[in-house]
């Protein structure tokens, strides 16, 4: 398995997971140097190579619930 690393604001983040729900694809990332720096972005529908911010706190909660459900034991 190859580790995918993305550069965001001059910081290197590894992709932890990528999950889809309701026509959205969320990407969960952790800073390689600081694992407490955890971010969630979504794939831009117009350009699949672009990650964009979530729309609001409600969408963040939804994305985190999806992550929690996908990572249950």
Predicted regions and their residues:
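FKBP-type peptidyl-prolyl cis-trans isomerases
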Residues: 3-5, 28, 62
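A general marker of short, structured functional hotspots
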Residues: 9, 22-24, 56, 63
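Aromatic side chains
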Residues: 13, 26-28, 67
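C-terminal structural segments of small proteins and small subunits
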Residues: 46-73
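Basic, polyanion-binding surface patches
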Residues: 18-49
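Short, charged/polar N-terminal "headpieces" of proteins
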Residues: 1-21
């Amino acid at each position: 398995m190859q580790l995918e690393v993305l550069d965001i604001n001059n910081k290197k983040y590894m992709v932890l997971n990528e999950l889809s729900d309701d026509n959205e694809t969320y990407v969960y990332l952790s800073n390689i140097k600081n694992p407490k720096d955890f971010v969630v972005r979504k794939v831009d529908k117009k350009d699949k190579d672009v990650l964009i911010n979530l729309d609001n706190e409600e969408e963040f909660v939804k994305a985190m619930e999806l992550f929690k459900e996908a990572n249950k034991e």
